[in-house]
Every structure is written in structure tokens, then in C-alpha cells.
């Protein structure tokens, strides 16, 4: 229970204190999108590393050397919990984006960070809109 409280506290404090950082990143994105993406990824990896450690997750990564670094890679996971995202961001070597359910847009600050990290929001109840999201994802991977 203490670990859960620490994780929630860390995430909430990060989201609150990162409000000015989000503004800075939005401005930087207009001038230098690659620098903004790198800084965003670094910050998200940092906080998710803290979340991972606070949660007491032990893990072993195998086969990282087989992931190509010269082209885009699509990872498809069997989503078991939100910790899939924590582990994905903290272990995968290249910039990573996730597809999230559309309802996540309604979570203040978190959704802004998700947009900043190139997450796409999938409307599972509307096949046409869902297909548009998938096609957008394909373009981003190219």
C-alpha cells in the first residue's frame, strides 16, 4: 500500500510541477521539434524510472541487441496493466509512442504529456475514426 501511495504521489507531483515545462516544450517544438521530442522523452523516461523504482519492479530485458536502430520498429504488446507503458518507455531504446483509448484525453495534464509524447487516441466505438488513428500511426512510424 505504501508503494502505491508513493507512486501516485510521484505522478501527481510530476504532473503539477511540470505545467511550466509543458509550456516550454510547446514553444521549443515550434522552433526545434527534434529537441522538444528528445527533452520530452528524457523527462518522461526519468519520471517513469522513478515510478518503476518506487513500485519495486524487478525486471530483466533480453534481446535488446536484436532491435534494429536504423529503422522504425512496431511493438505490439498484450496490455496487462499500466506498467506495460512504464516498462516500454524505460527499456525501449528509440523514441516510443503508444496508442491509448480515447477516454484518456479526459485526464488533465496526463493527456497533454501523452500528446507531447506522440501518443494517439483510439476511439474503439467508432470503426471509421479508429481506422484514421491507425493510419496516422502508420505515417508516424514511417
Regions found by a protein language model. Give the residues of each.
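Soluble catalytic domains of membrane acyltransferases
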Residues: 54-142
Amino acid at each position: 500500500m505504501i508503494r502505491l501511495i508513493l507512486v501516485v504521489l510521484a505522478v501527481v507531483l510530476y504532473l503539477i510541477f511540470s505545467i511550466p515545462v509543458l509550456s516550454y516544450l510547446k514553444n521549443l517544438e515550434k522552433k526545434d521539434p527534434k529537441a522538444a521530442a528528445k527533452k520530452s522523452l528524457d523527462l518522461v523516461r526519468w519520471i517513469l524510472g522513478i515510478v518503476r523504482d518506487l513500485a519495486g519492479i524487478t525486471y530483466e530485458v533480453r534481446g535488446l541487441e536484436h532491435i534494429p536502430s536504423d529503422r522504425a520498429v512496431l511493438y505490439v504488446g498484450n496490455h496487462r496493466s499500466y506498467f506495460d507503458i512504464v516498462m516500454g518507455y524505460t527499456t525501449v531504446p528509440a523514441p516510443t509512442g503508444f496508442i491509448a483509448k480515447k477516454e484518456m484525453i479526459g485526464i488533465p495534464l496526463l493527456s497533454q504529456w501523452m500528446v507531447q509524447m506522440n501518443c494517439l487516441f483510439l476511439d474503439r466505438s467508432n470503426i471509421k475514426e479508429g481506422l484514421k488513428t491507425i493510419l496516422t500511426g502508420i505515417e508516424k512510424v514511417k
